[in-house]
């Protein structure tokens, strides 16, 4: 009877360990996807916005895809008028919470912006956000972005 209990306990602990390892692997995949997507958001040139918009939408799904798509015309106008060029310098990411198919990533992007407003001189800055990641068809995509700069005023 003791042997049976030991085998049963070993099996239970083994399954718990496998679930934990699966969760850790999913968190790491989500973190890597968020870190890969951050420069996509922060690297753009007003002279080549079609490629920028395509890359952003390629990594987007759900609410974020709709929000970005809905505001892209206004964003294009502002970036073009301001002759804005942005480059991501450093990206830091961590997973706040999540499971095997969704996660919240805290993302901090160091960026340098050059524009009419900076008189053509590079100006360093930092952008922080929370990305809601969702695993869709085997890919981690961004479903929601919470950032002061990503807020859209309600009309």
Regions found by a protein language model. Name each.
Residues 1-43:
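Juxtamembrane and targeting peptides
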Residues 25-85:
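Core segments of small alpha/beta cavity-forming domains
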Residues 40, 113-119, 152-153:
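A short, acidic/glycine-rich surface segment
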